[in-house]
Amino acid sequence: MGKRINKKAKEGKETFFGIYQKKFELLELGTKKHLRDEKSDRGSFVPIEICGDSVYLSEPDGKLIPDDHGQQKCDFLLYCSDLPQTCFMELKGANISSKSRYNPYDQIMDTVRFLQKDEILRNLVNSDVEKHAFIVSPGRQKIPKGIETKKRQLWQLMVQNGKEKKKIYDLIHYVKVTK
């Protein structure tokens, strides 16, 4: 069973994320924010609004997950401990690429696998947690030929050991951001 954050943890008396506590930001109900990827060519972004309590934001790419050789990471991770639910967000400055180092499916899958291996962070992705992937880009989402298997692999990782099996389009979301 996944750990739940209690009131003491919210007040800072206990640390739910252990040594990773400083890598997570607690967002208040009603908070509006633009999540921005400064590394992308176009500085891609997505606006979010927090609609619940106990929502935490982290940046796996460069902050939460160390820059090990070959380790790919998604840009943002949102965790709501009340549901529990984890959302992985990959912001793209262009359409989805079939290149292995740049496709969002691999980046999100590697992030999930890293979390599964970590003693403290595995609670973000265990079987009790509903997981969603958001792939954000400014253009129309055209999925390159030959990458369908990556999409299916990501979906399988999202529903792995889950109580309720969901369809692929319920867990992988494509977002087009317009200015």
Regions found by a protein language model. Give the residues of each.
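Mg2+/Mn2+-dependent nuclease catalytic core
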Residues: A94-L115
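Short acidic, S/G/P-rich loop/turn micro-motifs used as interaction or catalytic elements
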Residues: L64-D68, A94-S98, R140-P144
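Amphipathic protein-protein interaction modules
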Residues: I108, V112-L115, E119-V129
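Domain-level recognition of nuclease-like catalytic cores that cleave nucleotide substrates
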Residues: G2-F16, N123-K179
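Histone-fold modules and their flanking histone-like tails across chromatin and transcription assemblies
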Residues: K63-L83
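Short, surface-exposed loop/strand segments
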Residues: L29, I50-C51, H69-Q72, S97, ...
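Conserved catalytic cores of phosphodiester-cleaving nucleases, focusing on short active-site segments
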Residues: F76-L78, Q85-A94
